[in-house]
């Protein structure tokens, strides 16, 4: 085992390895002080008399403490009272175990009711965990089951959020996934802090820590992970647990990415903890291989891959888990390797299904591959090859529609690069964009996410081309959500060729879509799109009065008081616009001069929901 010391002179507090201790052969202790301080004996302060106020806080605390001690002593002697206390403790523990059992049952069910029941059960577990007296009765099995459910909750919530066809707009403040995510994250941090406190030292094991670190990694709580690990390593009671191969497999890549250790230091830690092992666990082999690839040491990365293949053939460890590690390391050769020839070799093996093991082509690795290609000045044709092959691979999978987010991430990365390679409009760039759209349409139906991504990244500044892109929603019969209308409206803010009349048409189109889909309010996200298209655009001075006139007509259509307060507080930060904005609160219709005639249509669902002037006047003030 080794010690980690923090250097006071460095802001990053980089730890240094000082030593390794195995089987308690060496110990590190604090240097003894040269000054001996002896506590004074009570006789030195023997006062002849003491004065005590019976109503003093000290007296009160002493009395309360005495009562508590007396109660505890009585409880220890009174079998009836003791039995009652034990019964309550057992009831709490039984309830906790019952909730764990229910959570395991619900997590495997796919129906909506079971998923809701799972969330409610997990919430009960989080609340029960807050009881310190209950935690003291946990067994290792109880804590292990809790961390399993906690880790599954992280994964379950994240999958639901990313696979949903709905976009998590900022105005949807009652979003269930967002609410659950906050609770789960708090529970993860709470467990971490409880472990750091030493409360679970007697029942802690490597499997418990592994699940906790997995959960923290999902939330990208990297500083907290390193803090937990360093505290554990330096704890004489639990130090060896935190140097377990499973734990090192999770923490070493994080420590390297966060520049906590250099590549050489990582290798040293690895060698110190594996030199006496006959076989290294597959997780750690995978991790050291990933770190090697990230540092450019491809030879060692290939050595790790070969070691995993040998481990798979030997069947010394779970073949399923070894194959998962092989797949993970394979992905790192695709996404982390800066030699594109090597990356392409591993990429082709996946998309051509030419492997003895399965590799799930995760989009962050393809995202990284595309970025590496751009940074290394690869041709656009090569970038298109990787992009097109990935889209084809995804569309051929059974759950091709399962995770909409991966198409969004992939397309966003690709078109960000596309418009960097072609920053201006010309015949070549225009034809290339048409070619890309046609390629996508050959693989899978053109969808809203695809067109949203193109329009969102569009940077040529030509109104006619942008309108042609927008027409594709109709050409390809794309089912639209409010998001696409907002993106199109917002994009007009970047092009001065759009008149206020043009912007009003797009605003009305967005409202018509909301009304047709049963909205009875205008979401904050639509107000933000209008704001970015007008008053906060590069043409803001020419569109300011228009924005205020539109806002005046529709200000009571905001969702509710909470949304209204949020809307107003945004403008309080924009001091340069606050005087004009306050006209919405204290002005009348006559104060909004505008050359465009703004007429509110007859809606079926959209309607006034608040008294804007009444609410905002309490915030702004004259």
UniProtKB/Swiss-Prot annotation:
| UniProt family annotation | Belongs to the RMD9 family.
What is the official name of this protein in its record? RNA-binding protein RMD9, mitochondrial
Q: How does it sit in the membrane?
A: Peripheral membrane protein
Q: What is its main location?
A: mitochondrion
> Which cell locations does it reside in?
Mitochondrion inner membrane
Gene assigned in the entry:
RMD9
Q: Which GO terms describe its biological process?
A: sporulation resulting in formation of a cellular spore
Q: Which UniProt keywords apply?
A: Membrane, Mitochondrion, Mitochondrion inner membrane, Phosphoprotein, Sporulation, Transit peptide
Q: Where is the transit peptide?
A: 1-108
Summarize what the UniProt record says about post-translational modification.
Phosphorylated. Phosphorylation promotes binding to RNA.
GO CC annotations, alphabetized: mitochondrial inner membrane
Q: How does it assemble?
A: Monomer.
Q: Its function?
A: Binds the 3'-UTR of mitochondrial mRNAs. Involved in the processing or stability of mitochondrial mRNAs.
